[in-house]
Every structure is written in structure tokens, then in C-alpha cells.
Amino acid sequence: EPVMDDAADRAYRTTWLSDIHDFPLQVATLALSPREHVDSPLLVFQKNAFEVEPGTMVDFIDPSTGEEVGKAVPRFDTIASNLPYVDFNTKEIGRYSQIKDELKQEARAAGIKLHDRNDLYCYFCLYLERLLNDGGVACLLTSNTWLFSQAGVSFFEMLALKYQIEGIFVNGQARWFHKTKVMNALLVLRKKKP
């Protein structure tokens, strides 16, 4: 039992959850809250993912003191995300245009032309690489639309530049989420070591 307690405590102290919207954060907080010994803050925060980089300071409430505690976002061994299905025309996501331009410039330097019609999640998949440790794994739920488009070809080339692609899983039989109009793809990506 002590080993389980140590593993559970380690998971609790090293699991960070973030979203741009408050409802998913409320659900995450409720899911993490029922613990016997709550002696460290829940690492749940609201922020646009394009504004999160290693070293970004985030404030949490320490449950044992009630005081605000700042913690720096680390690099992660694992990132899991159900990415937003927002099209390429979005303007409401802060820093999106800047990050998109940076990634397009990086692609050009590698001889890859990222298509202007790539959706937000494509850039998010590429952006997450900077939050992973070398050899870290990203497990990302996306739309499958990029698999069948010209824009998807250059996106795949950029993924292959940054990551070892461990797998792309698609269910061609049914939608994973009943209210969505698109089929899903699950990407499992391992950040390449320099």
C-alpha cells in the first residue's frame, strides 16, 4: 500500500491540467479533489495553450495555508489533449497568429510549406513539442480531416520532422463523440532527441 500511496502522490504533484475554458477545469478539479490527504495544490489553471511555455509562472492556492503559490510550468514527459476543433480562420485565440507565423517560418527553413488552410489543432500539435522533454510523448485527439487533404501532407511532414510518429489511430466505423460532425484521429507522437 505505501508504494501505491507514493505513486498516487507523485501523480498528483506532477499532473498539470489546463484549458482556455472554465467548465473543463471545473470537471478536472472535481475529478482530482477526492483525496484523503490534500496537502499540495491542484495544478489546474486557465490559460490559452499558446501562452504556456516552460518557465511560465502559474499561481495556485496552497490548500494547507490558503496562500497563493507560484509554480513554473515544467517540460513534461507526457502530454494528453483533446484538441479544439477550430478552423484556420480563428482570430479569438491569443498568440495564434504569432505562433502560426513562427511555425510556418520553421517549416520553410526545413523546406516544408505549411498550408494556410491547416486548422488550429495542427499548429497546436506542432507547438506542444516545446513543452515536452526529449523523448516525451504526446497523445493527441484530433479531427481526421487532415489525413485526406493537401494541407495534411505538409502537416504530416512537419510532425515527422519534430516527432517520431508512434501511431495514428482512426476509427472508420463510427464517431467517437456523437455530437461532432467529424471523425477523430488519435496521434501518438514521441519528441525526437537532438
Language-model segments: residues:
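Signature of N6-adenine DNA methyltransferases within the class I
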Residues: 20-26, 33, 49-55, 65-194
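Short, conserved SAM-binding/catalytic segment
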Residues: 29-40
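Conserved SAM-binding loop of SAM-dependent methyltransferases across substrates and taxa
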Residues: 1-10
